Each structure stands twice: as C-alpha cells, then as structure tokens.
C-alpha cells in the first residue's frame, strides 16, 4: 500500500513513475491526499511526459480530474494537452469539465502525439467529427488557427473531402479567405507561373496514374491552396491527395521556381521539375521519388 511504501522510504517523486500519477490513475481520494501530504509533486511528469490529467484519463478515473485541479495542478495552466488528447474519445462529460475550468480551447503546442501543432478543433476536423467541431466552436474555438504546415479546419475538411464540414467552416471564416483578389495578393510572393494559375482554376484537377505506385493525384483549387513555411522557406501546397501516400504533398517552391515534393513525416523537400514538365508526365516525375 502507499502507506507502507512511504514508511519504508520510497521516492514519491521517482522520475520514471511519480507516485502522484499512479495515485490519480489507479486510486481514490484517500490515497491521493496521503501521497500529496507526504510530499508527492502534483506537477510531476513521467518518463513519457504524461501529467496527472492524462494519467487520470488513462485510468478512466474521471472523478479524480476535479481533485487534481483543486490541489493546484490547474486546468487553465496544465490541462490543454489532456483536453486535446481526449477529443477523439467523444466523452463530452470530460470535455465539459475542462471547459468549465477554463482550459485553453486553442491549445496547440507540439508533442509526441501531435508534433504538427494542431488545435483541438483541427484534431476533431481530422477525425471528421462535425458534432465535435460544432461543440468546440460553440465554446470559443478559433477556426482560423493553422497547424504547422498551414492547414486550418477548413483546409482539413477539403482534404478529407467532407463538403458539409468545409461549408460549415467556410461560413465561420472571414470572407476575405474566400475572395479571389485577396488570394491572388496572398500568392504574389510565390511568383506562380500563369500556366499553373490557370491549371488550378480549371475543372480537371483529378488524374489517375495507372502505371504509378501513386495510383492517382488530385490538386487543390487555386483558392484552397495552402501556404506554409518549411524552416525559413515559403512553400505552397498544391495537392489535395497523392494516392495512398498521405505524408507526401506536391508543392510549389518559389525559391527554385519548381514543383517539389514535401515529405511531412520526415520534413524533407525533394525538388522535382518545372511545372510544364511535371504536368506532361506526372507518373514519371513522381517515380523519381523512389
């Protein structure tokens, strides 16, 4: 028992498994109060950076969430990560607890699960959960915050092909986001060739690539292209999807004035060719990636 361990000099703040995390994950208030009284650190993280809120959620000890908050590990200061992680569980009672205690609803710090800096709303959009998206928006979630690679909830809905969700976000966004002149101004620094602009304004943006490992490629309409930064370099995402390769994106690189492929997982950029060369034989150009 906890008492026996304390009496025999156990380190309550062991770096691998701090006692406070074990208590909130597996035990009740009596044990939690006991370890805290004997010096357990309420802000402790374990070896994989899990905090008390996450530990209680892993153990489904939802009744301990309020205790953790009341002991001083506050939702406002520390609850963002656990809140974002619990979005995919669709447990609205738990989400209400965090929101009622002033969680940062737009929390978007990177971690091992979400290195690409999504907000909880972006996570809900990625799971194509419109009900959750509406719930978060009703509680103040910002629809304009982008992930590390420029994707915002609207762009995610477009990528997922969920037009109902895309329309929902579009109606919440500033009108200039969907204004052509505004988009052209935004794209000026990218120095897009005229032929690329007219291609992206055209109706034919989906291509089957039967002889290629990529199977198919679909481009984003001009208005939905996504500017983002790779280090200090500006890139423009052009592809909506590249067959089964979810981590690859076809981008325009204004520095080289060429089409390139951005590998999201490894954060690498592979230069391909000029746009007219790319469009004349997409399958062959893409094969060079292997």
Listing of model-derived features with the role each one plays in the protein:
Residues 13-22, 45-54, 76-86, 108-122, ...:
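Ankyrin-repeat boundary/"N-cap" motif
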Residues 1-58:
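A generic tandem-repeat structural signature
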Residues 91-92, 104-107, 114, 118, ...:
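Acidic, serine/proline-rich, intrinsically disordered low-complexity segments
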Residues 9-11, 39-43, 72-75, 102-106, ...:
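The conserved C-terminal loop/turn that links adjacent ankyrin repeats
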Residues 149-252:
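A surface-exposed partner-binding patch
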Residues 256-279:
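A short, surface-exposed interaction/processing loop segment used at functional sites
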Residues 274, 284-290:
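Well-ordered alpha/beta subsegment
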Residues 1-7, 27-37, 60-70, 90-100, ...:
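Ankyrin repeat structural motif
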